[in-house]
Amino acid sequence: MLRNDTITAIATPPGEGSIAIVRVSGPDAISISDRIFSGNIAGYASHTAHLGTVSHNAVYIDQALVLVMRAPRSFTGEDIVEFQCHGGYFACSQIVNTLLAEGARAALPGEFSQRAFLNGKIDLIQAEAIQQLIAADNIDAFRIAQNQFQGHTSQAISSISSLIIEALAYIEVLADFPEEDIETEDSLPKHRIMEALSITDELLSSFDEGQRLAQGTSIVLAGLPNAGKSSILNALTQKNRAIVTDIPGTTRDILEENWVLQGKNLRLIDSAGLRETENLVEKEGIARAREAMSQAEGILWVVDASQPLPEFPTILYQKPTILLWNKCDIVSPPQIEVPFQQISVSAKTGEGLLELKQALQKWLNTTQLGKSSKIFLVSARHHSLLHSVYTCLTAALNGFTEHLPNECIALDLRQALHSIGNLSGSEVTENVLGEIFSKFCIGK
């Protein structure tokens, strides 16, 4: 699976910028780069930087800072040369074209990371974390990916694997020497399987929370028609995302908008106003609104302070809820006692929105990862394979209770190890690797 050629690509995003980076990796990275650079790259020590000019066939291309990282002390485990040139499209693209003319090959998406994996610099779990780091759009998603890239998830998986291997080795001894009549009901292999199950179960149980943290906390704006839900959504996000009119029932479907508040990602969900209606389309919208309220993690219950107080749905008392008295610029809200926070706002003037943001921030901080080293699963691939591990370990444990032959228990444990191998990459197929790394950007 290892490639012996030398690859190159632009490692920075396209478009205008102060600096662009061109990366070269492979056995001929130094010799190819040396032919287009004014300095002596072949003579440079590893992990040093040198300023010079890039040219080809005596034609000047750009000034660049060259970084040399010799194998195996590099990201890919191969010789790497990086050219830091002026930003924009033309300088870096001309450097790439020159490197291609000198014998390098254009890198495939994720090929640098794939080489790092194939050369043992990172495992597959860490490699996948690279793409998660790049794609993270909020602080929680970034920290989850950071923990994964630092190897915390891999360490937990390795612990599961070690426990299974220890149990399997003991069981195989029992299978090879059945005449010893060793008692296994409360023996070492059973205890090791139970330990492995405990770690696996903890990882699996983190998936839903990990998904929520990575994708954002869902908060639905709900209330009667014309209470100002859509106006508040637009005011918070500073976008004209939702249609606003004086006609009740304008919003008839779920409208979702991502909103980052102090680095925390929220999914604000605008919903249809709740009321009795015979309009089939609006009725469907109301049904979806109620479903959104049941699925959301928090509710902003919007009330028009100038109108009679509506009845509060039971679900408001079952979830984190903030009561928003809208239109406080024209009327003072009534004084009522409810078990959730009340904030007076005006979607029209912006009054009270700062207090609302502070309240949301305070609530979100209760779910903030901070510097916690807790591991969260966010990959569906990881969850599926770990679920397979859990199933196999459960079957193996039941094998003791049902007094199954040791060979049957060993078979379940080997299957669990196979799933772990697919997870870490030690037994993964080339097709799976291709699918994973093809989602990466070129140059990473």
From Swiss-Prot:
Family: Belongs to the TRAFAC class TrmE-Era-EngA-EngB-Septin-like GTPase superfamily. TrmE GTPase family.
Organism: Chlamydia trachomatis serovar A (strain ATCC VR-571B / DSM 19440 / HAR-13)
Function text: Exhibits a very high intrinsic GTPase hydrolysis rate. Involved in the addition of a carboxymethylaminomethyl (cmnm) group at the wobble position (U34) of certain tRNAs, forming tRNA-cmnm(5)s(2)U34.
Residue positions binding GTP: 226-231, 245-251, 270-273
Gene that encodes it: mnmE
Details of cofactor binding: Binds 1 potassium ion per subunit.
Compartment list: Cytoplasm
Cofactor field: K(+)
GO molecular function: GTP binding; GTPase activity; metal ion binding
Assigned keywords, A-Z: Cytoplasm, GTP-binding, Hydrolase, Magnesium, Metal-binding, Nucleotide-binding, Potassium, tRNA processing
Main location: cytoplasm
Protein name as catalogued: tRNA modification GTPase MnmE
E.C. numbers: 3.6.-.-
GO BP annotations, alphabetical order: tRNA methylation; tRNA wobble uridine modification
Gene3D superfamilies in UniProt: P-loop containing nucleotide triphosphate hydrolases (3.40.50.300), Probable tRNA modification gtpase trme, domain 1 (3.30.1360.120), tRNA modification GTPase MnmE domain 2 (1.20.120.430)
Taxonomy, superkingdom: Bacteria
Residues given in the record as (6S)-5-formyl-5,6,7,8-tetrahydrofolate binding sites: R23, E82, K121, K444
GO cellular component: cytosol
Residues the record lists as binding K(+): N226, T245, I247, T250
The TrmE-type G domain, residue ranges: 216-365
Protein's UniProt keywords contain Magnesium: yes
Binding site for Mg(2+): S230, T251
Family annotation (InterPro entries): G_TrmE, GTP-bd, GTP-bd_TrmE_N, GTPase_MnmE, MnmE_dom2, MnmE_helical, P-loop_NTPase, Small_GTP-bd
CDD domains in alphabetical order: trmE (cd04164), TrmE_N (cd14858)
